[in-house]
Structure formats: C-alpha cells, structure tokens
Amino acid sequence: GTFDRYDEDFERKIWSSTGVNAIEFNGLTDLANAGVFGEYTYHAGDKFSAIAGLRGDWFYGQGFKVSPRVTLKYTPVDEIVIRANGGRGLRYATPLVDNIGVFSTGKEFVGAYNDHILEDAWTFGGNITYYMPFGASSNTYVSFDYFRTQFAQQMVVDYELGHNQIHFYALDGERSYTDNYQLDFSVD
C-alpha cells in the first residue's frame, strides 16, 4: 500500500484589467491505499504463455476496488511473436502536482483543482513482432503495436474552455480514450 501526504499551500495574485485577483489555498490531503497482488503464470511449452494477475486495493474514501490484468504470448514459429495484454489501472489524481506548469501561466484556476478523484482506466492492446533473417544478429525485426486506454473516470485540465482561465474537472464516465499505434523497425 501507499500513503501520500500532500501539503498544498499557495497564494496566487493575478493582475487583470479589473484589478488583482488573489487565490489562496491551504490544504493538507492524505491519500492512502492498501492492497494485495497475486499472479499466476502458465506455460504451454515454448509456444504459449499466459500471466493472469489480480490486485485488490482499499482506497481511502472509495472503498475496495479490484484491478485484473492479463498478458498472453504466442509464438507460432520462431520468427513471429504475438502478444496481447490488458488490465485496469487506478490512481488518485493530484491536479496541481501533476500539472505544475499551470502556475506559470498567470491564468485563473476554475473548478476542482484541489480535488483528488480516483482515476480509473482500462488499457488493452497487442503487439506482433517478426524477426528477420539478416543483420549482424538475430535481433533484426519489424514490430507493430496497438494499445487503447479507455478512462471511466479522469481528471481533466482544460486550457481551452475559458479565456485566461484553466478549468479542472472530472469527466465522470464521459468518453475519454487514447489510441496508440507504433511501427518499429530495428537492424542489429
């Protein structure tokens, strides 16, 4: 488990045409979680392996949450490796700590900048690698990866919503995702 204590104490003065806008924030935040993790590994010769993991965490103020994950690896022939994996990730958002650059903008903070929501995301994807029979060693390959992260709960720092303002808000289940593609070629 972890125990993080954030003592956030700041005073910002923002000069504008309407005068000085002062924001003061003094907050001591304790973010605690305790958990246990276990995994099982299965091998079917040299062709297939699977790792299944399960993590259970108690989050302060949120209760007990379960985070499963699985990794699969299949090698149909020596030159080709296929991998797939997926799982859930949970963490407390720390909007000001995670986005320290907002202090240098001179913009007003609006919304939940001092909230520490529990972010919840699922990531899944895969990889296929083909090892090529040339180069100085057997490590010459071409590889393609695709991964998607789908957020069920996410803290957003929005620089675009308001003029001279930075908005902090939780998506609360609204659509938020990332898709990552990568093609890699390596000659050794």
Describe every region a protein language model picked out:
Residues 1-50, 169-188:
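Outer-membrane beta-barrel transmembrane domain signature of Gram-negative proteins
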Residues 3-9, 54-60, 86-92, 101, ...:
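Transmembrane beta-strands of outer-membrane beta-barrel pores
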Residues 1, 52, 70, 84, ...:
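Membrane-embedded beta-strand positions of outer-membrane beta-barrel proteins
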Residues 30, 34, 57-67:
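Solvent-exposed loop/turn segments connecting transmembrane beta-strands
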Residues 9-18, 62-68, 95-101, 108-110, ...:
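Outer-membrane beta-barrel translocator domains and adjoining extracellular loop/strand segments
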Residues 9, 75, 81-83, 117-173, ...:
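Membrane-embedded beta-barrel scaffold of Gram-negative outer-membrane proteins
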Residues 34, 66, 110, 122, ...:
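Exposed loop/turn and edge beta-strand positions of beta-sandwich/beta-sheet ligand-binding modules
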Residues 40-42, 56, 64, 72-75, ...:
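Residue-level signature of outer-membrane beta-barrel architecture
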